UniProtKB/Swiss-Prot annotation:
GO molecular-function terms, A-Z: inorganic diphosphate phosphatase activity; manganese ion binding
Annotated binding of Mn(2+) 2, by residue: D15, D75, H97, D149
Localization, UniProt: Cytoplasm
The organism of origin for this protein: Bacillus cereus (strain ZK / E33L)
Domain of life the protein comes from: Bacteria
Gene: ppaC
Catalysed reactions, as listed in the record: diphosphate + H2O = 2 phosphate + H(+)
Cofactor binding summary note: Binds 2 manganese ions per subunit.
InterPro entries: DDH_dom (IPR001667), DHH_sf (IPR038763), DHHA2 (IPR004097), DHHA2_dom_sf (IPR038222), Mn-dep_inorganic_PyrPase (IPR022934)
Identification of the protein by name: Probable manganese-dependent inorganic pyrophosphatase
EC number: 3.6.1.1
Binding site for Mn(2+) 1: H9, D13, D75
Length: 309
């Protein structure tokens, strides 16, 4: 049987990795030769979850057409966030919870996108719909994805469905969601030992906003100053990325997991759009974004609207 690769976006977060593992397992149970892979490095937060539940991480691939003809996307759909040669393969399915943009196919596909906080929440339903029992380890990874995407249920993207799914999965996994979740988030917020290049690419996504090319990277921290003390070095590597990719804006968002506020570092010719979007003034290229924790709900749509205004 021909193999199908299942993967999340570039610079994968916990949902991208864990949902690829969980959905590949469901597809295998349903008779497909599916393998989860990843398009980037595994973050400290994700590695904590993999280690905790004793699951091996997916292997890394840069291209997919050299291996398979068919793929399944989880936790993304936008072409620039996917495999470099995504146009050379057939996308069979998409399971996602983001906006739909820069995506089209030549054939009809199974496309499931729901306005929930995490892809794993959708997968929890799909396991039940197909009558497949979720293994303890996989339940733990799916729980980890929901905790990560919802910032332990504090993000405005978090829905009642996410909370209910997390409670169900925690029971299967045999953990206390709140206690385990805080441990996992703290592991993810430990940025010691990371280079500046790693910091700005840990969780970075590229977007087309009107005519503007924008990249938004986000890291969680227990104290934003632990990251911003390196601002001069950060600006240097961000400026290099802006030039290399021809970006109009690179927004580096440092989120405090204790206060649920963020600081944005904006570099590029369109940095003023951040001021316009949030009614703030950039001082030394930074501004505090009160109550902003979600790139999907509080940054991407707000900036997109500001660029198109």
């Amino acid at each position: 049987m021909e193999k199908v690769l299942v993967f999340g976006h570039k610079n994968p977060d916990t949902d991208a990795i864990c949902s690829a593992i969980a959905y590949a397992e469901l597809k295998k149970e349903l008779g497909m030769n599916a393998e989860p892979v990843r398009l980037g490095e595994i973050s400290g937060e994700t590695q904590f979850a993999l280690n905790y539940f004793k699951v091996e991480g997916p292997r890394f691939v840069e291209t997919v057409a050299n291996e398979v003809d068919n793929v399944i996307l989880v936790d993304h759909n936008e072409r620039q966030q996917s495999a470099n040669d995504i146009e050379s393969v057939r996308v069979l399915e998409v399971i996602d919870h983001h906006r739909i943009a820069n995506f089209e196919t030549s054939d009809p596909i199974y496309y499931r996108c729901e306005p929930v906080g995490c892809t794993a929440t959708i997968l929890n339903k799909m396991y039940k719909e197909n009558g497949v029992t979720i293994r303890k380890e996989v339940a733990g990874l799916m729980l980890s994805a929901i905790i990560s995407d919802s910032l332990l249920f504090k993000s405005p993207t978090c829905t009642e469905q996410d909370v209910a799914a997390a409670r169900e999965l925690a029971e299967i996994a045999g953990v206390d969601a709140d206690k385990y979740g805080l441990e996992m988030l703290k592991a993810g917020a430990d940025l010691s030992g990371k280079t500046m290049e790693q910091l700005i690419s840990l969780d970075a996504k590229e977007f087309q906003m009107g005519n503007a090319k924008v990249e938004i990277a986000q890291v969680n921290a227990v104290d934003t100053n632990d990251v911003l003390v390196h601002q001069a070095e950060l600006e240097k590597v961000i400026s290099a990325v802006v030039e290399e990719k021809g970006l109009d804006l690179f927004l580096f968002v440092v989120t405090d997991i204790l206060t649920n506020d963020s600081v944005g570092l904006a570099i590029g010719k369109a940095a003023n759009i951040v001021e316009k979007a949030y009614n703030v003034s950039l001082e030394n290229n930074t501004a505090t974004l009160k109550g902003v924790v979600s790139r999907k709900k509080q940054i991407v749509p707000v900036l997109t609207e500001a660029f198109q205004a």
